[in-house]
Amino acid sequence: MKYHDITPEMAIGDLVKSKVYGDFGTHIFTDMTPDHWNAPLASYGFEKVGFVPTLHRMEELASTGKNYLYPLYSEEERMSEWDKESPAFLHFPGPVAGRPYAIIIPGGAFNRQWGLVEGMAIAAALNEMGYTAFVLFYRTKQDAVVAKAIEDMYACIRQIEARADEFEVQAGHYMIGGFSAGATLAGEIGSTNFGWKSAGVPKPEMIFLAYTAVRMKDFYAGYTAFPAGHPVHDGAAAFLRRVAGPEITPEAVEPFDLTSHMDASYPPVYLTANEDDHTAPFSNSLTVAETCEKLGIPHKTRFGKTGDHGFGLGIGLEVEGWLSEAVSFWEEVR
């Protein structure tokens, strides 16, 4: 097909306004602020995050006129609980039926979601590798929203499993992963307190965590070490309110400190991050890797020295190729 032009000078808002991307376009960036709406694609790393192939795949799917956006909850549930209206997932069908599938969870500090760079770009690349992928959009922008986001994650898995024949995927066989806050959420599926066992869903065959944030005790330490008005205090406070609620205490934060709730049954893990990450410190990913080593959990890492946060596919960085490596690891351990 003949694709619409995509240039580095185009703004995120131009993509959202375009009709050629259908429902995919409305989920490029949730709860967007003017700074992102007006930002040129070049400012995110035009080639680094794979804008062109991703937008082409979105245009291909939208051009079919089929539905690829699915609400997580029934109409009755959406009517009775106001915040269950927005949670949904996007379906990126792969070229081969009956294969395992992947669920991708974009990040955004539980305040919004960078759906294109940390969701659709990964799904489009997985399609190229022969896999069907689903991009999860969960509840954000509330105090104590992580527990609700975990509920959304399991609602997504249950719906895909129940409709496996319709989606032409292999039930019970999947990889799940996420980026930043999305990785925080994905990681909980293996935890002893919020994990797949308590939710009654199939165990994921592998989890990938990209620049994850799991050391909640460290975020709490930053919150208490600096006074109100200091950027470290205020940034940690905003994040921890969304994680644990308005009463930020060690007791409220502790259940979400992932490595305190991992055991040997945790699924195999693939980790990627950069040492110079200024948003989710590299120590988060390193701690997960060290915990996996200690507990004998199969794991693989692709760490870079530079590249910071939010790199998505990471094309042109030291970590380039991490997704292909993660998929190979998934195929090896499943």
PLM region spans:
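Mobile cap/lid helix-loop segments that gate and shape the active-site cleft of serine hydrolases
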Residues: 74, 218-261, 267
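Acidic catalytic loop of the alpha/beta-hydrolase fold
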Residues: 112, 216, 276-280
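Short beta-strand/loop motif that positions the catalytic acidic residue
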Residues: 265, 270-273, 277
